[in-house]
Amino acid sequence: MITIEDIKSAYNRINSFIVETKIYSSEKLNNNYAANIFLKNEVEQLTGSFKIRGALSALSALKEEGVEGVVAFSSGNHAQGVSKAAQIFDMKSIIVMPKDAPSNKIKKTKSNGAEVILYTRHIESREKIAEKISEERGYPLVKPFDNENIIAGQGTFGL
């Protein structure tokens, strides 16, 4: 279970790398739902998504442990987050992406220094491919879920 202390700890590890994004309120949404609704514009982040928060949190913790590289799988936003975080922390990143992922996401992931491994969706398992690479190279697999440092990092958008 992730606690507020975990989220604050993640924030302390990543705050010098993230963009402080603005919070907006929409009168139309507030009126439609009879509530105060707030929107946070995470498209302003380094990679255009909140996923960089979790990636920075996870990779900063791994870097502290002496890990030199990571493996991840994603169709786009997690791939860009992990590859950018790896670039920031001078780590190797290997990202498994589907061949039909948006070409701009593949290109951006590569431009962050990642080694991109393409697979055929619905025929191959991205998780099995990533697990095999992780085992062969000795790098941990950083999943976009089931990772407490990823979750705590994503939670920093609320601080």
Language model features by range: what are they?
Residues 1-159:
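PLP-dependent amino-acid enzyme catalytic core
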